[in-house]
A protein has these predicted regions:
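Phosphate/dinucleotide-binding and metal-coordinating scaffold of catalytic cores
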Residues: 1-394
Length: 394
């Protein structure tokens, strides 16, 4: 949202832009409201208190506050035990300052799960102060959702999916599995932060997700609910400064997400970097989670025939159901987006799959849950085989 020369205020879609900076989980929003004593869960009320470290380059402060100098690094060193204490407070109080601090951690992270963020500096974890941004997000396990689906191994699941996506050659946010006390977390390196060339301060890099780019509120992030789908995002990427590369990358990501049964690839899980002069380009992938470990029938399982992708592919009709999608639907969807070589993209992904699996298997640490690894690798193999058979049909 560039500043208008006339200083005329934005209306309508501006609320959606700011709503997308916040967690899209009502319970988390209500806990933030209670923690800071704001009158509502309205985005502007919440961001007036927690907007000091938003996704991208934004810093939002109360009207009477001046931002401290951004070109310096100020922080408090944390022990492993203190990080564990901070994590223990995150579930009950997602933005607690923790320890002996009277100052809450005023960060805003989008998404639906419990998480916090810290600064990693010279190998030590630190609580940023002043205008110093966080550099890493610490994501806790999702646990059991209201439908009884057990996502307690989401940390391992997301780590493995990231390794697989990286193996296919797609850029993806770097992540590791770390343990602090009783808490296992996925530590994700923020790609909207960069150390300055003189190594004296951390830069915030402007970015926005595709809900923000389209003026869509987070409640409508799925295409079936009115959010952007493949066709709309591919149209927007025509304007990317590296349009051919980004459009091919996005379509490859869609196929790989289907292979992984990564069914939550909605518009908030794809973003663009905002560059000087009004340019933009696609960011790395992030938040990739496979449904294979919870597929099945009965309580606490997702029936494969009912699973839906976040974005539709096209044939004579739109297809969301994971089980119904075939290679021809990807080819037709790409054709509508002006990409003629989708068949070769699919063939490349299929051919690469065995090598990707072998590499990911070699990276698995000791104690990694067999259910996650076996179900994801078996599912990936089966889906690649299906695509191969689809391409062989006349």
């Amino acid at each position: 949202m560039p500043l208008r020369p006339s200083k005329e205020p934005y209306r309508n879609n501006v609320a959606a832009f700011f709503e997308n900076l916040l967690p899209d989980n009502r319970q988390i929003l209500e806990r933030i409201q209670r923690r800071f004593g704001v009158p509502s869960v309205n985005a502007f009320d919440l961001l007036s208190q927690i907007g000091r470290d938003c996704v991208g380059a934004l810093q939002l402060l109360p009207e009477d506050q001046e931002p401290p100098n951004v070109k310096q690094i100020t922080s408090k060193k944390l022990s492993s035990e203190q990080v564990a204490e901070l994590l223990s407070q995150t579930v009950g109080n997602p933005l607690a300052g923790g320890m002996d601090s009277d100052e809450p951690l005023r960060i805003s992270l989008a998404g639906a799960q419990e998480k916090t963020a810290l600064l990693l500096r010279n190998g030590s974890w630190r609580l940023p102060t002043g205008s110093t941004p966080t550099t890493h997000i610490l994501k806790l396990p999702l646990g059991v959702n209201p439908q009884g689906i057990d996502l307690s191994s989401s940390v391992e699941n997301e780590w493995l999916c990231s390794e697989i996506v990286k193996g296919y050659g797609l850029p993806v946010a770097g992540c590791t599995i770390e343990t602090f006390g009783e808490f296992k977390v996925l530590v994700v390196e923020r790609f909207d932060r960069r150390l300055s060339s003189d190594r004296k301060w951390y830069m915030r890099l402007p970015q926005e997700d595709f809900c923000q780019a389209c003026g869509i509120p987070p409640a409508l992030k799925y295409e079936n609910d009115g959010g952007p789908g493949i066709l709309r995002i591919m149209e927007m990427l025509i304007g990317s400064e590296q349009a051919e590369q980004d459009r091919r990358q996005f379509m490859r990501a869609q196929v790989i997400f289907w292979l992984l049964a990564a069914i939550d690839g909605h518009a908030k899980n794809f973003s663009i970097f905002l560059l000087p002069g009004g340019s933009y380009r696609l960011t790395p992938c992030y938040d990739v989670l496979s449904a294979y470990p919870v597929m099945g029938h009965g309580r606490g399982k997702l029936a494969p025939e009912k699973i839906r992708m976040a974005m539709a592919v096209h044939g004579k009709n739109r297809h969301y159901r994971w089980k119904e999608i075939q290679a021809r639907h990807w080819i037709e969807t790409a054709r509508r987006c002006g990409i003629a070589e989708m068949r070769s993209v699919i063939e490349e992904v299929i051919t690469t799959t065995p090598q990707v699996i072998r590499h990911a298997q070699s990276q698995i640490p000791k104690g990694f849950p067999d259910l996650i690894a076996d179900s994801v690798f078996d599912g990936l193999n089966a889906a690649a085989k299906q695509l191969r058979n689809d391409l062989a049909k006349p």
